[in-house]
Amino acid sequence: MADTQYILPNDIGVSSLDCREAFRLLSPTERLYAHHLSRAAWYGGLAVLLQTSPEAPYIYALLSRLFRAQDPDQLRQHALAEGLTEEEYQAFLVYAAGVYSNMGNYKSFGDTKFVPNLPKEKLERVILGSKAAQQHPEEVRSLWQTCGELMFSLEPRLRHLGLGKEGVTTYFSGDCAMEDAKLAQDFLDSQNLSAYNTRLFKVVGQEGKYHYEVRLASVLNTEPALDSELTSKLKSYEFQGNHFQVTRGDYAPILQKVVEHLEKAKAYAANSHQEQMLAQYVESFTQGSIEAHKRGSRFWIQDKGPIVESYIGFIESYRDPFGSRGEFEGFVAMVNKDMSAKFERLVASAEQLLKELPWPPAFEKDKFLTPDFTSLDVLTFAGSGIPAGINIPNYDDLRQTEGFKNVSLGNVLAVAYATKREKLTFMEEEDKDLYIRWKGPSFDVQVGLHELLGHGSGKLFVQDEKGAFNFDQETVINPETGEQIQSWYRSGETWDSKFSTIASSYEECRAESVGLYLCLNPQVLQIFGFEGTDAEDVIYVNWLNMVRAGLLALEFYTPETANWRQAHMQARFVILRVLLEAGEGLVTVTPTTGSDGRPDARVHLDRSKIRSVGKPALERFLRRLQVLKSTGDVVAGRALYEGYAAVTDAPPECFLTLRDTVLLRKESRKLIVQPNTRLEGSEVQLVEYEASAAGLIRSFCERFPEDGPELEEVLTQLATADAQFWRDQVQEAPSGQA
C-alpha cells in the first residue's frame, strides 16, 4: 500500500454543506439567478482539472464514465465479485470522491498527490469489467491506458505540485523552470498584461532560441474581436533575446458554457450593478480580458449587500508555483442575516480599529473604503477547495482605490467547527474542553479580523506611469530605519508579481497576525458578544489554535526540496516561530510519548503572558511585515519571511523531528458534499446528498445531466492537444480518445 502521506484514509470525514433554510428564503427570481450562476461556476470549475496535472482530466472522465453507468452501490456488487474487499472498494470510492472534491488528483490544501489505496491490478479489473467498459470498450480502455500509470505513480517529481524538477504543474509546460517564470513575468509587466488568466508554454525554436507562448483563457481564439483592448496585444514579440507569442483560447469550450449561463443569469439580476457586472464577466471570458474582469469586479464591489452573492473568475494564485496565475473558482451564496449584523458592527468600528495597528498612518490607505462584510451560506463553491473566508477582489489597484468585499462562509465554518475530542492532537488535556466550547466563536472573531482588517489594511507605495507618487517622499519616514522611503512599486508592478513565490503566504501571515493582535481589543470582543471571562477564553483559544496550527503546519513542508506547499500553514508556522522567539515561557512545544507508546508532542501557551509577552512580539513583527510590503522591499521581505519559515532540527524544538510526529498523527481534511440546483419548469429545486464518499460521487454524477459525456470529451481533447508539453510526465492519449 502507498505511503499514508499520499492516500486519503477510508474513515476520512465527509460533511454536507447545509444551506436548505437560506435557499428556502429566496424568491423564485433569486433562485433562478442563483441557479444560473451556480451552473456557470460548476462548468468553469472543470478548468481546474486542466490547471492541476496532465492526467487529471482523464481521471475525471474515467470516473464519470464509470459512475454514470453504475452508481456506487451497483459498482460495489461488481467490484466485490471481481475480488475486491469491502475496504478496497471503499478506498476506491474515497479516492474518486477526493478527485471530485479537489478537482484533480492533488490535494487543494497542501498540493500533495493522492493515489488509490488498493492494488492497481484490482482496480484495473473493476474498470475494464464495468458496465461503462461494456458500453464503450475502446473509450474506457483508452482512458485507463492514458491515466492508469500516472494515477498510481509516486515518482519523486510527481508527489507534489511545483515548477521544473520540484514537481508537477500545468500552469507551465514541463520544461519550464523558475527562470522561465521570472522572464515571463518581466515580459507580462512590460506589456501591462496580467498573469491571472494565463498559462506559459515553452518550445525550443530551430535556431536554438526559446519560443514562449503566453496563452490567455477565452472563448475566442483567432477570431478578430471588435473594439477589444486585447486585440493589439495578440501578436509576436522579441523580449530579452527570446521570442514571445501572446495567444488566447485556453479552455474555450468550457468558458463558452460559463458565458451562456452568465447571460441567462442576467435576466434575473436584482439591479443594474449585477447586470453590468455580469456583462463585463461575459466580456472577460469571451475576450480573455482581465481589464474587463476588473470592470466587472468594480460593479461587484458597488453591489452592496445583495441577497444572492457570487464571484467568478481566475482568482487565487496559491497553486501557481510562481504565485501569479489564478485558479478558476466560482461561488454562489445566500446572506446569513444574524451573523452579518455582527460583521456590520465590526465594519462600523473598522476606521477606529485600523488606528490600533502597529504602523504609522502614512502606511495605511488614504481613505478607508467601507466594504461589505457579510456572513454567507454557500450554495455552490466550484474550484479545488472551499475556504472559510474571502477578501476579494485581489486586484491591487481596485483594492487601493475602489475597496473590496469581505465574506465569511458560515456553513463552511460550521463544518470546520465540528471537532471530536479524541481527534484533538498535541493539546494539554485541560485545554480540550475549553477548546471545543470556544473554537467556533473564536474562529468567527479571527476570520472577521483576518479578512476585514488583515487583508483590508495597509497601503502600497506606488509611482504611476506619469511618475507621480501616492505618498509624500519628503515627509514619510520608514519606522524601521528612521530614513525616507527608498523603494516602492513602479507602474505595472503588483504585490503578486513583485513578491511572487512568497506573496500569498506572506500576506496570509500578515492577516493572521492582525487577527491575533486585534482580538485582544475588548471593543472587538464586545461586538461579537463576549465580555469578562468569556472574552478571555475566546482570546486564549484563538491564540492556542494558532500555535497548535503552527505545529500541524509541518505536514505541509517538504524537507527534500525545503518547500512549503500551503500558504496559510506556512504563515501559521511563521507565527509560531515568532511567538517561540518571544521567550519567557509564552509558548513551549515539548516532545512526549503518547499513551499508545508512539512519539507525541504537547503545545503549551501561558495565557498569563499573551498580553505582556505575546502582544509586543507580534507588534514588532507585524510592523516589519507591513513596512516591507508597503515599500515593495522584496529582498528584505524575503529574508525576514524565509528566515522564520525555515524548518531545521535545531534545538530546543527540533522541528524536522517533530514533523515525523505530526505526520504520524495527522488528520485528513474533511471532504464536503455540495447540493445541486435543478430547473423543473420555471422552478428551481435544491437537491441534497448524504454525507459520504458515495453521496459526494452522486452529487457530481448529477451535476451535468444534459451534457456530461460531451464535457468529458471536451476535457480529454483539450488535455490531449497539450499533452506534448508534458511528454516526460504523461503518455499522450491514444487516438480515438473520448
From Swiss-Prot:
Subcellular location(s): the record lists: Cytoplasm
A Gene Ontology annotation in the biological process aspect, one of them, is:
proteolysis
EC number annotated for this UniProt entry: 3.4.14.4
The prosthetic group or cofactor this protein requires is: Zn(2+)
Q: How is its activity regulated?
A: Inhibited by spinorphin, an opioid peptide derived from hemoglobin.
Q: Which residues bind Zn(2+)?
A: 450, 455, 508
Which keywords are on file for this protein?
Acetylation, Aminopeptidase, Cytoplasm, Hydrolase, Metal-binding, Metalloprotease, Protease, Zinc
Q: Which GO terms describe its cellular component?
A: cytoplasm
- Record text on cofactor binding: Binds 1 zinc ion per subunit.
Q: Which InterPro entries match?
A: Dipeptidyl-peptase3, Peptidase_M49
Q: Which domain of life is it from?
A: Eukaryota
Query: What is the protein name given in its UniProt record?
Result: Dipeptidyl peptidase 3
Supply the source organism for this entry. Answer: Rattus norvegicus (Rat)
- What is the gene name? Dpp3
